[in-house]
């Protein structure tokens, strides 16, 4: 059977750390959607390992790792990460695989991404989406319009050449003249095809066979539910299904196989890019949280937007994903605050609303209702058991559980693997 780890906010919740730790209990770790717009940073023995494509479970040398069919893969980035693993002495051979059905992100897609952002912003950031400019949206657009290329197409040279040439021609028609050496790119991808061969498998068959063999599969979600193409704050979303449904379409598995849904929740809220953010704090509180939590994007390096925890968002994402347990991360970052707040409800025109609104105009007019909590003003990094937490921290955790209706089983109190409290009695 399978378990899935999903972000419950706007990304950057700390999913990679939990995947790294829990992967020790699984035979297979798989990513189902997204591409190099994901950024997971894992700290092991004081050393940082940043991954954008390869699942965080690669650090478990007993687990196979899959880049699933729902992903979009930029091969230069993939090979750079593989080299990084090799340089760090991490064994990946024979256990890192790429789906033959995954779509390819070309440098062309990244160029188009940047041009579209510039087109939207028109010199300002008011209308831009705030993408990572990694070519993710344009690649998914090529996929949806049936003009993209998949990993398996690398091994059909004539088809690859014809489709790739047509793809470039179509982009020239849309964006005008821009420099792009088609022949050089085709030659480069001929070389990539040979380099990639040892990694390519039919991942759909592989995963379903793994289930038949009684193996345990951990699905590593990328981005987050509030960036989901359907359920996020459209159009300020990613281009894939980053909620639980994406696991089935992005891996080719039955919903019945997914039995545990773990929502990862940062103890406050962060966001990269444009779009609404109801609990955002553009003041000394936001600045202090950003500094204490080192809130800068793994993929972009941009300073993240900061706000208090939003329980309305958490109830919404929990409803969509049917979370069975939560992982509360970065609780230690709140240790310096005298007062901590949670946004518990939204009011629209004076009335409390029951659900997260689809309309961004409605959302912009919502007033956040806050509850305040006393801080604990002490270092939590040494805490290894729930009972060792100060009462103020326990009360904060308890209130989140009450507001969302899901138990918090894992609590992060630092960046290292060892800084994770596990409430085993709740599992």
From Swiss-Prot:
Gene Ontology molecular functions: adenylosuccinate synthase activity; GTP binding; magnesium ion binding
Cofactor(s) this protein cannot do without: Mg(2+)
Pfam families linked: Adenylsucc_synt
UniProt xrefs under PROSITE patterns: ADENYLOSUCCIN_SYN_1, ADENYLOSUCCIN_SYN_2
InterPro entries: Adenylosuccin_syn_GTP-bd (IPR018220), Adenylosuccin_syn_Lys_AS (IPR033128), Adenylosuccinate_synth_dom1 (IPR042109), Adenylosuccinate_synth_dom2 (IPR042110), Adenylosuccinate_synth_dom3 (IPR042111), Adenylosuccinate_synthetase (IPR001114), P-loop_NTPase (IPR027417)
Cofactor binding note: Binds 1 Mg(2+) ion per subunit.
Main localization of the protein described in the UniProt heading: cytoplasm
Pathway entry: Purine metabolism; AMP biosynthesis via de novo pathway; AMP from IMP: step 1/2
UniProt-annotated binding residues for substrate: 298-304
An annotated GO cellular component: phagocytic vesicle
GO terms classed as biological process: 'de novo' AMP biosynthetic process; adenosine biosynthetic process; IMP metabolic process; purine nucleotide biosynthetic process
Group of enzyme by EC: ligase
Active-site feature positions: 12 (proton acceptor), 40 (proton donor)
Presence of keyword tRNA-binding: no
EC number in record: 6.3.4.4
Subcellular location: Cytoplasm
Keywords: Cytoplasm, GTP-binding, Ligase, Magnesium, Metal-binding, Nucleotide-binding, Purine biosynthesis
Family of this protein: Belongs to the adenylosuccinate synthetase family.
Function: Plays an important role in the de novo pathway and in the salvage pathway of purine nucleotide biosynthesis. Catalyzes the first committed step in the biosynthesis of AMP from IMP.
Protein name, per record: Adenylosuccinate synthetase
